[in-house]
């Protein structure tokens, strides 16, 4: 075995160890039949929606099929389609998001959520993105049971399981994995005293804590509302927890097209990375290096007699198996797409560079026809 081959194997081996350490802890929702109906808390689900006539019906239908009844509020954020009409037809309460004419710069999802909270007196508030879907009749019960374990206090957030249908949607695989790993909660090496980050698609809290922390008002000038919420609850010494949605909560992201997907990940990727603990970021980088070394070793072995093709193929296979295993925790991605991990890695790097440019230099990102300034 040559020095080059030894170096490639060692590098890939280090990547495998890093991949294990960065995501060797899991927090999954669970449903206990014996505890069904145990809660006496009133619950409201608040859904910020802008031009969501295609995706909103799936969420509202899944909410109507739950084993527990909840109030459903849809905040229509200046939609120009049938979002409001469809929501009313499906039994939701609909309110318009109104903006004053005094130079109000607080717009978008966080503002819609903040207004939505003012329309309910329920004990527990659940904010859900319009692209979320509950996967079975006990999903909401599982969410509430999990929240009950923290005595119905603080903030609980959920990253839905990503389902995909079109080929380009599989390119979101690494972004979803990094979203989970980057919150600093899913590794045994995470520092417990670090910043409390939260996922944005589904957040759960009680009304009194929301008022105490001022809720989404903390995200008035931030592009990732989940991070702002987590930090606000942490400042008030309230618990902040994060869960994976697999088995109970899912979403389909960016079904509108490839361009929308790029815009969506661009608007917050670099911001999210800046909040990841340094040693977790180091594990992520070392793991990503495996994409390069395992593929390069395999490719070079086809042309260089000094490299064993069998050993390089084994190294590539081991890395790819771990790559598939980690990604299937966060989404229903094609094994074929995951097997060509070097392409997914290239897309991730290009979008990350573009995100970094927007967030640190242009200070502007575009999303759903709106231009957002980044402070």
UniProtKB/Swiss-Prot annotation:
This protein's record includes keyword Hydrolase: no
Places the protein is found: Cell membrane
Keywords from the named record: Carotenoid biosynthesis, Cell membrane, Glycosyltransferase, Membrane, Transferase, Transmembrane, Transmembrane helix
Keyword field contains Glycosyltransferase: yes
Gene3D superfamilies with a match to the protein in the record: Spore Coat Polysaccharide Biosynthesis Protein SpsA, Chain A (3.90.550.10)
Protein topology in the membrane: Multi-pass membrane protein
GO terms of molecular function: glycosyltransferase activity
GO biological process, one term: carotenoid biosynthetic process
InterPro entries tied to this protein: Glyco_trans_2-like, Nucleotide-diphossugar_trans
Top-level division of the source organism's lineage: Bacteria
Pathway: Carotenoid biosynthesis; staphyloxanthin biosynthesis; staphyloxanthin from farnesyl diphosphate: step 4/5
Intrachain S-S bonds: none
Record GO cellular component, one term: plasma membrane
Documented EC number(s): 2.4.1.-
Segments passing through the bilayer: 7-23, 112-132, 280-300, 333-353
Function: Catalyzes the glycosylation of 4,4'-diaponeurosporenoate, i.e. the esterification of glucose at the C1'' position with the carboxyl group of 4,4'-diaponeurosporenic acid, to form glycosyl-4,4'-diaponeurosporenoate. This is a step in the biosynthesis of staphyloxanthin, an orange pigment present in most staphylococci strains.
Stated family: Belongs to the glycosyltransferase 2 family. CrtQ subfamily.
Protein name as it appears in the record: 4,4'-diaponeurosporenoate glycosyltransferase
Native source species: Staphylococcus haemolyticus (strain JCSC1435)
């Amino acid at each position: 075995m040559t020095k080059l081959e030894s170096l490639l194997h060692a590098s890939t081996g280090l990547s495998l160890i890093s991949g294990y350490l960065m995501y060797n802890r899991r927090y999954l929702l669970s449903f206990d039949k014996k505890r069904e109906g145990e809660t006496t808390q009133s619950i409201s689900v608040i859904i910020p929606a802008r031009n969501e006539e295609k995706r909103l019906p799936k969420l509202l239908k899944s909410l109507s099929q739950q084993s527990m009844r909840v109030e459903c509020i849809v905040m229509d954020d200046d939609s120009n389609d049938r979002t409001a009409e469809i929501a009313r037809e499906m039994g939701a309460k609909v309110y318009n998001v109104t903006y004053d004419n005094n130079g109000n710069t607080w717009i978008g999802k966080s503002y819609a959520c903040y207004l939505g909270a003012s329309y309910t007196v329920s004990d527990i508030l659940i904010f859900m993105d319009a692209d979320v879907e509950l996967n079975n009749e006990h999903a909401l019960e599982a969410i509430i049971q999990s929240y009950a374990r923290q005595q119905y206090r603080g903030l609980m957030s959920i990253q839905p399981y990503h389902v995909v249908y079109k080929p380009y949607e599989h390119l979101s695989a690494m972004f979803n994995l990094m979203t989970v790993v980057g919150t600093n909660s899913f590794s045994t090496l995470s520092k417990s005293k670090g910043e409390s980050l939260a996922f944005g698609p589904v957040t759960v809290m009680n009304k009194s804590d929301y008022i105490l922390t001022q809720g989404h008002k903390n995200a008035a000038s931030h592009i990732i509302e989940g991070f702002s919420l987590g930090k606000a609850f942490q400042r008030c010494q309230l618990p902040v927890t994060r869960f994976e949605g697999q088995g109970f909560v899912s979403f389909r992201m960016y079904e509108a097209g490839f361009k929308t997907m790029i815009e969506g990940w661009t608007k917050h990727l670099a911001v999210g990375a800046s909040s990841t603990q340094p040693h977790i970021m180091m594990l992520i980088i070392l793991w990503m290096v495996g994409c390069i070394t395992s593929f390069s070793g395999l490719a070079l072995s086809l042309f260089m007699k000094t490299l064993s093709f069998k050993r390089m193929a084994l190294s590539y296979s081991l890395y790819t198996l771990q790559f598939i295993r980690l990604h299937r925790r966060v989404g229903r991605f094609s094994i074929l797409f995951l097997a060509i991990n070097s392409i997914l890695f290239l897309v991730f790097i290009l979008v990350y560079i573009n995100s970094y440019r927007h967030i640190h230099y242009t200070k502007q990102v575009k999303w759903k026809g709106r231009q957002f300034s980044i402070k």
